[in-house]
Design a protein with these regions (language model features):
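Catalytic cores of TIM-barrel enzymes
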Residues: 1-117
């Protein structure tokens, strides 16, 4: 009988024999963005957007699980936001009083501070 992903992982972790070897993956942020094409700012800061993306990739590639890299999640990221500029497909510039952030599908955000930290 075929196991569910959860049963398969639990069996392997308990040193029991699963129906097959559990398959897991850890995507880079750039790879996830290129696959999903989300709003790059929401993907970086919004927990639900990030979680939905992980679930979609797990289902798309039929993995038993995904190893999660936690990153910029912040509930108050909009608090000091001065402006948001769309620079092209999948590319956004955020302006804050102390810094500029460039978000894109290809890589992690690039942050430039206005004064030395």
């Amino acid at each position: 009988m075929e196991m569910t992903s959860k049963e398969r992982i639990l069996a392997a972790m308990n040193l029991q024999r699963p129906d097959r070897v559990p398959l897991m993956c850890q995507f880079s942020i750039g790879c996830m963005m290129e696959q999903l094409h989300p709003d790059p700012v929401a993907f970086w800061y919004d927990q639900q957007t990030f979680a939905d993306g992980l679930i979609e990739l797990r289902e798309r590639f039929r993995f038993d699980g995904i190893l999660v890299s936690l990153h910029g999640h912040s509930d108050d990221w909009k608090r000091d936001l001065l402006s948001r500029e769309e620079l092209g497909e999948g590319s956004v510039r955020l302006e804050y009083p102390d810094r500029t952030e460039l978000h894109c599908w290809q890589d992690l955000p690039v942050v430039t501070f206005r004064s030395p930290r």
